[in-house]
């Protein structure tokens, strides 16, 4: 915004704004994604793109992979002339190293992918500092799927097949795993539940990434299976090798689901709960009682979007990404992707951990007012020596 010294009744100052890196960022590697959400994952890539040096606290369950990837990053940094220390990787099994990193006064932000317990522990620690810093934590989700009768009538078998694959993909170790299916009570939903159960039991179970995830999965599955009013409609019972997760599908009424908050919690693995709602009003009530989620999906047709508009609105209010006639497990890396959501899916629903917008987590805006042109950052100088796209007087230019 260029200055207007002759403006009446008051002169307008020359004000120019750009983004600057926050400073050193600590990234905690995810246990379920040794590559895409770990040492060289989206947090690291976006922080480096923002101009921030990165310290990775490697996950102990894949420290060897972390070391290999770290070596590649350091070689790339040297090859491209990046400053020494722009990236480092630390290994430890305990929590002390991570705690000290978050508390260090030169660290300015934290990226985390993992459990609600772990994310909130870091969030609390960061806010207890003399200078609190942001913690961008992605902490999981049950990713509700609303299936309307029309979807079952038109393509019930197709959706059962697709969701059997989605629920079991990667042994269910996706944070976008569809762990909750909501439908309206009736023969159609019963038929869908039966077909989904049959399809999921046809698939060969696969190994989970490490014993800790496997143990937590079985603990959560067994806990929910024993809750009041819950029926286990699919349970893989054949013999498997160590750490192989047996898929399971549960079914429960809408009333029982509403009355039991335990059923709203994530079970991380090849697992999903089908909720039989007495009508669309109860379905909407359930959505309004859910915590924040990464994704929500609608299976139906365009007429359903109008007929059940309030249901769709309730779902949208709870999620960072809402899908129509798809499965949520794929996350495209692009500028329009939102991988985040209202708490506790993430600590700040305004940001994403996937896509180019993830960079915005690691920067802060600075305005320069009435600054001499030659002393401005090149990105703000009149001549635009960098040739970048800029917003000038409300219009994009380059």
Stretches found by the model and what they are:
Residues 2-164, 182-189:
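Rossmann-like NAD(P) dinucleotide-binding subdomain of oxidoreductase/dehydrogenase enzymes
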Residues 32, 61, 94-96, 107, ...:
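Short, glycine-/Ser/Thr-/acidic-enriched flexible segments
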Residues 101-106, 149-155, 221-222, 246-248, ...:
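Short, surface-exposed amphipathic charged segments that create phosphate/polyanion-binding patches used
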Residues 173-175:
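Extended low-complexity, polyampholyte segments enriched in Ser/Thr/Pro and acidic residues
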Residues 365-398:
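Structural signal for terminal/edge beta-strands and the immediately following C-terminal loop/tail
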Residues 1, 70-77, 81, 105, ...:
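Structural signal for hydrophobic packing residues in well-ordered secondary-structure cores
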Residues 183-294:
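NAD(P)-dependent aldehyde/semialdehyde dehydrogenase
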Residues 240-243, 280, 285-376:
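C-terminal core of ALDH-fold dehydrogenases
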